[in-house]
Amino acid sequence: MKKRWIALLLAAVLPIGVLAGCGSEDMPELSLDSITAPVAARNEMEVRTALGNYTGISEAAPDSADGEMATVQFAGDASATTALHDGYIYVLSNSELRILRAAGASTTQLNTLDISSGTSSEDSYEFANALLVEGDRLAVVTTASSMDSDLSGSDVCHLRLYDISEPSTPTLLRTFSQDGLYEGIGTANGLLLLVSSGTADLDEASGSAASMPQIGDNAESEAVPAAQFYLSSVLDAPTFSIVSAISLADAQRSGVRAFTGTIDHVCVSEQGVFLARSIRMESHGDAYKKDHYSVTNHAINAATELLRLTADADLTMLASKPLAGEVAAWELNAQANALYVVRSLS
C-alpha cells in the first residue's frame, strides 16, 4: 500500500492523532484507545512481572549492535562522532578519542585518549555512539556489547564526562553507565540527558524479569529503583528504556526515569525531553466461512506513542499521546514552542 508522508505540527500539549478503521464490516477495528498512558510502578516485582508479560501489541525491539558509528541529530545541538569546538576537533573512533587543532586549512593531532570501558574481548566489543560539547564539558558515549555462551547478549551504554578547560588534555570527571543500547543525548537547563533501550533477561520458570536494569556511577552499579519506572500499556517484548539526567556542573547523576518498552526517537530542549516509540498494532476478526474455507481477517497498522518529560532532575512525565503512523523524523523548534513531527501512514 502506498505510503503518505504527513508533516504534523504539535503544540506543547501534544494533541492526539486519529487512526481510521479498516473499512470492512468483517475486518477488525484498530483503535488508539488501546494505547493508554504509562503508569507508575508500585514495586520491583511489578516491574519484573511487566517485563515478562506481553499484551499482544508488538513494539519494535532495539536494533542489534552492529559496530558502526552512529550519528544522531537532536534539537539545538549536533551529536555525532566528530565535534568541533573553539578551533579544536574531537574525533571518536570506537574506543579511541583523538584531539586535533584546526588552523586554517591544516590540522595537527595533539592527543589520543583510550576511552574504552575495558570490556572488550573475543565475545564482546565496544563501539562509538556520540560526542557532545557543551561549554567546557565533553561527553563521550559508547556501547559495550557482549555475547554469553548460551548465545544471549547484553548491551551497556557508557558515558564519560570530561572537563576540557584545557582542550588538548581533557580531564575525566566521572563515568556513567546504563543498561541498553544508546538512543539519544541532549543538554538542557544545565543537565545532560542520556537515553538507552535494552532487553531484560527473563526467568523462564517465573515468566518475569530475572533482574532489574542497572545504572552505574564510576565503578559502582545498582538497579534502577522501581519507584522510577513507568509501565507501558503495550509491550510485546521484555524491553526497557532508561533516561538519565546528569549535572554538567558537578558531574553527578541528578535523576533517572525508566519505562517498559523501547524508545526510537529523542528530542531535548528546555521545554522538555520528548520521546517516541513505534508500536505495531494487530487485531484479528472472528472466523467465518467463505467458498468452503474458514477465513479470519487480520489487520495490522503502526502507531507511535509520544512521551514528554520535564527537562530537570525529576524527569516528571507531563504527557503521553498516541499518534497514527510511524515517526520518520522530527524537529523541536524551541522558538516556536512546537514539535514538528513527520510520520508515515499506510
Segments (PLM) and residue ranges:
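Intrinsically disordered regions, especially transient/low-confidence alpha-helical propensity segments
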Residues: 1-2, 19, 159
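Bacterial N-terminal signal peptides that target proteins for export
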Residues: 1-9
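Beta-sheet-rich non-transmembrane sensory/scaffold domains
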Residues: 22-346
